[in-house]
Swiss-Prot record:
GO terms for biological process: glycine biosynthetic process from serine; tetrahydrofolate interconversion. This is Serine hydroxymethyltransferase. GO terms for molecular function: glycine hydroxymethyltransferase activity; pyridoxal phosphate binding. The modification N6-(pyridoxal phosphate)lysine is found at residue 236. The keyword Protein transport does not apply.
């Protein structure tokens, strides 16, 4: 039987059907291989995650939950979603898990829908001091639908002062208190947040999107025993697909499930749910724990190098003097470089980071006076102590030399590290299997 036009089109490989997209994907693979990725919110997923996410599951609609779908033919995706939920609960010691959120922002929107009503007060870390858009930023849904109040870091220590958080909570009586962050290099005291929430009659929500992988490995205090609800992305330190996850006490299960579907979303992306299931299996391995340990070690090596005499002399400071997590915040307020210039300089060298506001930043958000530098992707790439030390020295030297940096020499050092730790060996351009 001859192929119909539709059958032919459905079996043509990407490079033949759409060479423009294929070339762009090839270019991105080359960029990831040949440069060093140090954006704190990015990571490299295992090839098995790529395979799951690029599977035929992208074809399947599955509104509802396992055993309670609004579509037929869900017997296989039910198995996958159950695996993802059960594994997530095992990894984090949680009573309840919802693996359907398309992204962290959708997870956070569902959490607020479940815990609060429109115009209720919510108390979270200021975006300008390391919080996230979804914690009450005025242009975000969280700042439009709810009365958002922000706590800030102490101007001297650059750390969260729990006594001041308590004072604000007692004064404002929020419905929800939010812990967690997007750019804060220290542990938070979840027990203290719980105590404050209980004192003022608030629910406690922790957004652990950035440090979930460290929690899973037992290398960071877990918010799960303290919080009513915990949300996270799966793609940062966890190293899974770009997507969201909600964990909670069982008492919140019904409200949270309803808030995700039909509250925030229709059908889940089952290819992403499958990739989450794979990521949760990986998170239970010794190799994963080793990777998280190297992530922390790399961040501490970087913080130490950026505290050296040459960088300090160039006006570079490490916010809070160090780090407890996977990222370092470099304060450039006294440097000749602003955040944009520093990001561009490191990009020329072959290291990808992002400019980031520091607390009390005098510069506009598109320029900033800081850099946020993370180590998860390099740990996933296999970097060891010596390699992290070399990368930290490249960054420290570049920031110390500033506009006089020897870009060519520094780029050669970066290229050597990239060659020594190859990425996705055997992956042929855009082909995922």
């Amino acid at each position: 039987m001859s192929d119909s036009p539709q059958t032919i089109q459905h079996n043509v490989p990407l490079a033949e059907l759409d060479p423009d997209v294929a070339r762009a994907i090839d270019g991105e693979l080359a960029r990831q291989r040949n440069t060093l990725e140090m954006i704190a919110s990015e990571n490299f997923v295992p090839r098995a995650v790529l395979q799951a996410q690029g599977s035929v599951l992208t074809n399947k609609y599955a509104e509802g939950y396992p055993g309670r779908r609004y579509y037929g033919g869900c017997e296989h995706v039910d198995v996958i979603e159950d695996l993802a939920r059960d594994r997530a609960k095992q990894v984090f010691g949680a009573e309840f898990a919802n693996v359907q959120p398309h992204a962290g922002a959708q997870a956070n929107a569902a959490v607020l829908m479940a815990l609060a009503s429109p115009r209720d007060k919510i108390l979270g870390l200021s975006l300008a001091h390391g919080g996230h858009l979804t914690h009450g930023m005025h242009l975000n849904f969280s700042g439009k639908l709810y009365e958002a109040i922000a706590y800030e870091v102490d101007p001297e220590t650059m750390r969260i002062d729990m006594d001041k958080v308590r004072e604000q909570a007692l004064k404002e009586k929020p419905t929800v208190i939010i812990a967690g962050w997007s750019a804060y290099p220290r542990h938070q005291d979840f027990a203290a947040f719980r105590s404050i929430a209980d004192e003022v009659g608030a629910k406690l929500w922790v957004d652990m999107a950035h440090f979930a992988g460290l929690v899973a490995a037992g290398l960071h205090p877990s918010p799960v025993p303290h919080a009513d609800v915990v949300s996270t992305t799966v793609h940062k330190t966890l190293g899974g697909p770009r997507s969201g996850l909600i964990l909670a006490k069982q008492e919140w299960a019904k409200k949270l499930n309803s808030a995700v579907f039909p509250g925030q979303q229709g059908g889940p992306l089952m290819h992403a749910v499958a990739a989450k299931a794979v990521a949760m299996k990986v998170a239970q391995t010794e190799e994963f724990r080793d990777r998280q340990a190297r992530t922390l070690e790399g961040a501490k090596i970087l913080a130490e190098r950026l505290s050296a005499a040459d960088t300090k002399g160039a006006g570079v400071e490490v916010l809070t003097g160090g780090t407890d997590v996977h990222l370092v915040l470099a304060d450039l307020r006294h440097s000749e470089l602003d955040g944009q210039q520093a990001e561009d300089l490191l990009h020329e060298v072959g290291i990808t980071v992002n400019r980031n506001a520091v607390p009390f930043d005098p510069r506009p958000p598109m320029v900033t006076s800081g850099l946020r530098i993370g180590t998860p992707a390099l740990a996933s790439r296999g970097l060891d102590t010596a390699a992290f030390t070399e990368v930290a020295d490249v960054i420290g030297t570049a920031l110390a030399q500033g506009k006089n940096a020897d870009v060519e020499a520094l780029r050669a050092r970066v290229s050597k590290v990239a060659e020594d730790f190859p990425l996705y060996e055997g992956l042929e351009d855009w082909k995922l299997v």
